Amino acid sequence: MKKVRKAIIPAAGLGTRFLPATKAMPKEMLPIVDKPTIQYIIEEAVEAGIEDIIIVTGKSKRAIEDHFDYSPELERNLEEKGKTELLEKVKKASNLADIHYIRQKEPKGLGHAVWCARNFIGDEPFAVLLGDDIVQAETPGLRQLMDEYEKTLSSIIGVQQVPEEETHRYGIIDPLTSEGRRYQVKNFVEKPPKGTAPSNLAILGRYVFTPEIFMYLEEQQVGAGGEIQLTDAIQKLNEIQRVFAYDFEGKRYDVGEKLGFITTTLEFAMQDKELRDQLVPFMEGLLNKEEI
C-alpha cells in the first residue's frame, strides 16, 4: 500500500473578496493574528504526516515563496538583538516541510489547479487542502482522512454539516450509506440551488485522492461558474471506484470571506492569554459605547 506523502495546496485565486488588500498581496498571506493563513494549512499537513507539499500559485504570489524561504539577514538581525522567540517563529516557517511551487497560468478553477500538479504527484495517493478552511482539531483534520484512506484504499472527501440555508455555497454530498462518520456517496453536487441540496453535508476543503482522479481532470470539462470543477471529477471517479466522505471532527473556520476572517482572527486572539487579557476589556468598552 502506498502511503499518502504528498499534498497540493491551491493558492492561485485572485482573492477578489478582500480587495483592495489583495491587489498586491496574496490572500493566502493575510494574517490571522501573527501567522498568514496558508501557514496554518501547511502546519496541519505536516502534523498529519505529509512530507512534500506543492503550492499551486498564480501571478503576484511571490510573497508566499518568500515567506517559506530562508531569510538570513532577518534571522541574523533577530539573533543580534536577542529576540530568540521571534527568531524561532521565523525559522519554523522556513523549516516546516519540503515545499515546491508551480504556477497555474490561467484561472480555470479548482479542478484545473489540482491538475496542474499532476507531474509532481505521479502515481501516488495524495491530499488536497484548501486555504479558505482552517481546522482546529485534536487529531488534524487531514490525518483523520488519511487514516480512513488506509482503511479503505479509496478517495476520502472531508465533510461537515452546515446550516441548510447555506448549502448553496458548497459542494454537497448525496449519501448512500453510512458507517460511523464515514459515508458511501451516491452523488456529489456542486453548489446546488437553494432548497435542492440532497443533504447538509458540505465538502469543506480537505481531500485524499487516488491518482485516478487525474484521468477526469485531464478532460478539462467546464462546469459550474464556467470553471473546471473538482467536484465534477470526483463524481466521475465515483462511477469507477468507491469515493467516501468522512465527517471529520474539529472546528472549521471559513477565512475565505470577510466576516469569517474577522471572527476567526478574534477567536484565535482570544486563545492567547496575553491578548485575551487586553482584548476583553477593549471589546467590553467598545460594545458599551452609545454611538455604536
Swiss-Prot record:
Pathway: Glycolipid metabolism; diglucosyl-diacylglycerol biosynthesis. Its EC number is 2.7.7.9. It is found in: Cell membrane; Membrane raft. It is a peripheral membrane protein. InterPro entries: GalU_uridylyltTrfase_bac/arc, NTP_transferase_dom, Nucleotide-diphossugar_trans. GO terms for cellular component: membrane raft; plasma membrane. Its main location: membrane. One of its GO terms (molecular function) is UTP:glucose-1-phosphate uridylyltransferase activity. SUPFAM superfamilies: Nucleotide-diphospho-sugar transferases (SSF53448). It is an enzyme of class 2 (transferase). Disruption phenotype: Under aerobic growth condition, deletion mutants display morphological defects and the cells are curled and show some bulges. No aberrant morphology is observed for the deletion mutants under anaerobic growth conditions. Induction: By heat shock, salt stress, oxidative stress, glucose limitation and oxygen limitation. Expressed under control of the sigma-B transcription factor. GO terms for biological process: enterobacterial common antigen biosynthetic process; UDP-alpha-D-glucose metabolic process. The keyword Nucleotidyltransferase applies. It holds the Pfam family NTP_transferase. Disulfide bonds: none annotated. Keywords: Carbohydrate metabolism, Cell membrane, Membrane, Nucleotidyltransferase, Stress response, Transferase. It catalyses: alpha-D-glucose 1-phosphate + UTP + H(+) = UDP-alpha-D-glucose + diphosphate. GtaB is the main UGPase enzyme producing UDP-glucose under both aerobic and anaerobic fermentative growth conditions. YngB augments UDP-glucose production under anaerobic growth conditions. Catalyzes the formation of UDP-glucose from glucose-1-phosphate and UTP. This is an intermediate step in the biosynthesis of diglucosyl-diacylglycerol (Glc2-DAG), i.e. the predominant glycolipid found in B.subtilis membrane, which is also used as a membrane anchor for lipoteichoic acid (LTA). Has a role in the biosynthesis of all phosphate-containing envelope polymers, since UDP-glucose serves as a glucosyl donor not only for the biosynthesis of LTA but also for wall teichoic acids (WTAs). Is required for biofilm formation. Belongs to the UDPGP type 2 family. PANTHER family: UTP--GLUCOSE-1-PHOSPHATE URIDYLYLTRANSFERASE (PTHR43197:SF1). NCBIfam families: galU. Interacts with FloT. This is UTP--glucose-1-phosphate uridylyltransferase. It comes from Bacillus subtilis (strain 168).
